[in-house]
Amino acid sequence: MKNLVMQKKRGRKPKVKETVAFDPKSVQIFKGSELSFNESVFRPMSTGTLMDSILSTDKGLMPAVNMIICGGPGSGKSTVVLDMLSKLASKGKKVLFVSGEMDEIGHFKYCKRMPGFKVVPTLFLKNYTETVRETMEYVFDQGYDVIAIDSIAEVIEMFKDTYRTTESAAVLWFLNLQSTVKKGGNKLKKYTSFINIQQVTKAGDFAGSNRLKHMTEAMSHIDRIKGSDSRKVYFSKNRD
């Protein structure tokens, strides 16, 4: 049962915060032997690139994973992710790129430079700033094999601005949405994998809530090698 609590700050309209009444009967504890999922959750999605060798021990992106790819400005995060999505799309996987930073013109120019990216369906989140939550929940519910989000920071800021809430509340919604969808909570019951793009600070530290780092299965880092167009990609955490 949800109760509505009104919060009012000086000079601002009151915010509505939902609180959930605790029901002890809803608590469940499982043994590993009691859990059951479709075997498809163990089938890696191959990109056919070198990325497969580090995405998992099974050589490919595993279903039902939410991972973060982080790096500094210009390190090539979006390029690497879009390349992965385009390769997966060419192999019949249903993919989605959620762009919180580029609009249609920017993406069109990007695809002009990288023609292979034209096959990737893209949601331009700037067109839905007043309905960020509703839009993302509706689209994700359609069912995808892989969804990439560029970037976590932009989605969190949009959510905070639209619903006049805190960063912790926005992060909680973001993580809960991905948790539900990756477990098959969508119309097609797909075990969706999420690739979340995030920047790092000038000092090279992760920019964002530590909760994001701890509540995701994998953390990947991209560094551009000085004096070349090559990039170094490595994982500091990968449960697959």
Question: Whereabouts are the PLM-identified features?
Answer:
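The Walker A/P-loop phosphate-binding site
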Residues: K2-M114
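Phosphate-binding/switch region of NTP-binding enzymes
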Residues: Q178-D240
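Conserved catalytic network of the ASCE P-loop NTPase/AAA+ motor domain
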Residues: G60-L61, K87-K91, P115-G116, Y138-Q142, ...
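Short, flexible loop motifs at catalytic/binding sites
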Residues: D23-V27, G32-E34, D141-G143, E154, ...
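Short beta->alpha connector loops
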Residues: S75, T129-T131, V200-A203
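A short acidic, amphipathic alpha-helical/loop segment
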Residues: V80-M84, T135-E137, N176, G208-R211
